[in-house]
Amino acid sequence: MTAQGSLVANRGRRFKWAIELSGPGGGSRGRSDRGGGQGDSLYPVGYLDKQVPDTSVQETDRILVEKRCWDIALGPLKQIPMNLFIMYMAGNTISIFPTMMVCMMAWRPIQALMAISATFKMLESSSQKFLQGLVYLIGNLMGLALAVYKCQSMGLLPTHASDWLAFIEPPERMEFSGGGLLL
């Protein structure tokens, strides 16, 4: 070992925080060490040629996907207060405006329930997809129940006996009378 090499070695033992960058082989971190072929350019301490994956970005993406899936699942429940306000403003009279409101209140949940498989495809990446799907289904069923309630309060549902008179056969006459004569 040469005198300069032993000095570098001793210096490395005493001061572990010091890195000797000068010298032919004593701690030099040039491209020649990594196979680049150029010994004069130096890499900084801790530099890696390969890209290090950032786990915080992956974690953030997973959290955003979960948040988006919950937004989709809670969408029908968020519409219920607005539907209640529209029901109140439309009134209980049978006219074109309240009838259109009731039709739209019933059609939107039916349409969402028919397209539930497409919605579940968006929820597949979530870890809580069963619970989110259940919340989505309950929200749409509640919207449909509100529409049925509004139809009942407007009198559009056949809930009385008089609503079914068209389907009842008229009673048969047991006898016919004409004045005071028997026929």
UniProtKB/Swiss-Prot annotation:
Q: Membrane spanning segments where?
A: 67-87, 99-120, 128-148
**Residues in compartment: Cytoplasmic:** 2-66, 121-127
Domain of life here? Eukaryota
Naming one, the record's GO cellular component terms include: membrane
Among Pfam families, the record links this protein to:
EMC4
Supply one GO molecular-function term.
Answer: membrane insertase activity
Biological-process GO terms, alphabetical: apoptotic process; protein insertion into ER membrane by stop-transfer membrane-anchor sequence; tail-anchored membrane protein insertion into ER membrane
The alphabetized UniProt keywords are:
Acetylation, Apoptosis, Endoplasmic reticulum, Membrane, Transmembrane, Transmembrane helix
Q: Which residues lie on this side of the membrane: Lumenal?
A: 88-98, 149-183
Provide the family line.
Answer: Belongs to the EMC4 family.
Function, as annotated: Part of the endoplasmic reticulum membrane protein complex (EMC) that enables the energy-independent insertion into endoplasmic reticulum membranes of newly synthesized membrane proteins. Preferentially accommodates proteins with transmembrane domains that are weakly hydrophobic or contain destabilizing features such as charged and aromatic residues. Involved in the cotranslational insertion of multi-pass membrane proteins in which stop-transfer membrane-anchor sequences become ER membrane spanning helices.
Annotated protein name in UniProt: ER membrane protein complex subunit 4
Species in which this protein is naturally found: Bos taurus
Q: What is the lineage of its organism?
A: Eukaryota, Metazoa, Chordata, Craniata, Vertebrata
Gene encoding this polypeptide?
EMC4
